[in-house]
Amino acid sequence: LMPGEFLSIVGPSGCGKSTLLNLIAGLLTPEHGSITLGGRPVSSGSAAVGYMLQKDHLLEWRSIYKNILLGLEIRKELTPEKLAHAEALLQTYGLDRFRDARPSQLSGGMRQRAALIRTLVLEPELLLLDEPFSALDYQTRLNVSDDIGKILKSSGKPAILVTHDISEAISMADRV
């Protein structure tokens, strides 16, 4: 993938789309061959790969802001620069007014946007999206996928989306 390129992988349920992302993320080890990113082999917990799942996995007992900082806390990277970056992402993507809200107070689309910011704040080299809109109703899915597509394009990061929805893939990706 080139910088800023968006690739979609389309297929029916059970065909191995999520398994492929798990291999790319280093969560699974290939039986043969290897997977590299920037010439380096990927491994579990690699900071180079950001992974956005089907469910947002926001923790209800934490505010949106604290949820966004979770990965930085785990990595022990809560630097002033990273906190400023988190604040900028909240503002840029319209969640600054909801920084103190709990996840249950947000719509499904806003929750997905918070999950994406949580991924972007870690500044990965590659973004993986595993059917991140599948839990949303049709109209919300259209709006959120358009918003998130714009966010990803503006980030300049390459991204891989897996989906079973061909129209979603075509509307978001540079290549399918």
Segments predicted by a language model, with ranges:
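The feature captures the beta-strand-to-loop junction immediately N-terminal to the Walker
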Residues: 10-12
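Helix-to-loop junction immediately C-terminal to a conserved catalytic motif
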Residues: 25
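Conserved ABC transporter NBD signature motif
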Residues: 33-45
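Short coil-to-helix segment of the ABC ATPase nucleotide-binding domain corresponding to the Q-loop/switch region
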Residues: 62-69
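Conserved ABC ATPase "signature" region
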Residues: 69, 80-98, 149-150
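Conserved signature/switch motifs of ABC ATPase nucleotide-binding domains
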Residues: 101-104, 118, 122
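Catalytic Walker B motif of ABC-type/P-loop ATPase nucleotide-binding domains
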Residues: 127-130
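Conserved H-loop
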Residues: 156-162
